[in-house]
Amino acid sequence: MAWFDDTYYFEQAQLRIAHITDCHLFSDKQGEYFGVNTAEHFTRALTDIAKQQPDALIFGGDLTQDHSFNSYLLFAELIHNSDLDCPVFWVPGNHDEIDQLNLISGGQIQRAKHIVAQGFELILINSKGNTPAGWVTPSHLEEIMACLVDSDNRHIAFCHHNPLPINGYLDKHMLENGPQLLNLLVNNGRVDALFHGHVHNDYQQQFRELDIYATPASSVQFTKHSATWQQEDKGAAYRMLHLNAEQQKVHIRTDVVWLNE
């Protein structure tokens, strides 16, 4: 099956989307990443997200830290035990294995990478490369182009890796062909924004007329604009998107939610 073959449909022209990323789970609930219990942080974020009553949750990658299959099972357990009643979608991070993500998909956790609402669509891009850095393969770029040209709707894109430098330590692991992907999205003329994770903090950038948003991690944050790898426990975080299609435009309102504030 090609990446975008499975499509999920919403009938409405307004969506509330929760974007949560980089939970870095372990095989058990006591695992800690830089002193942070990642399962506790993720659970706390899911509890708060459920109160927002989103239409969908998009997980932005880096589910696992110890690369165990039990960490994937823990992710599914925490989702299923939460108060969330919406579908959950995902993109793979550099820590993740797509086959393992597919194994926990089914029911509430969806495999679909193409989400269609009235007047706009969401595309979930695979930026996982052979190294911690990101790479969108030539064949996947063709799939993205085909998905975009197949519809006159507005589009919003999601991937894991940052496509532009953030002037920080993780730039060495950014999306290596980020400008190529961004030019494809901008040149299409119907893509309004791209959302990503990976950098463990919130950023807002622009490439030509495309808005780019980084969502902070649900686990631990990496200090902004630091050439060395510095961590901060600022509490669990996620992003909410309020999307509204009107007169061949999609209006985007987005806010980061910091649970320690």
Curated annotation (Swiss-Prot):
Tree of life domain: Bacteria
Cofactor detail note: Binds 2 Fe(2+) ions per subunit.
Entry keywords, A to Z: Hydrolase, Iron, Metal-binding, Nucleotide-binding
Cofactors, names only: Fe(2+)
Disulfide bonds: none
InterPro entries reported in the protein's UniProt record: Calcineurin-like_PHP_ApaH, CNP_phosphodiesterase-III, Metallo-depent_PP-like
Pfam family, one: Metallophos
Residues bound to Fe cation 2: D62, N94, H160, H198
Molecular-function annotations in GO: 3',5'-cyclic-AMP phosphodiesterase activity; metal ion binding; nucleotide binding
EC number: 3.1.4.-
Binding site for Fe cation 1: D22, H24, D62, H200
SUPFAM superfamilies listed in its UniProt record: Metallo-dependent phosphatases (SSF56300)
Annotated binding of AMP, by residue: H24, D62, N94, H95, H200
EC category: hydrolase
Family: Belongs to the cyclic nucleotide phosphodiesterase class-III family.
Protein name, UniProt field: Probable cyclic nucleotide phosphodiesterase PSM_A2567
Lineage, top ranks: Bacteria, Pseudomonadati, Pseudomonadota, Gammaproteobacteria, Alteromonadales
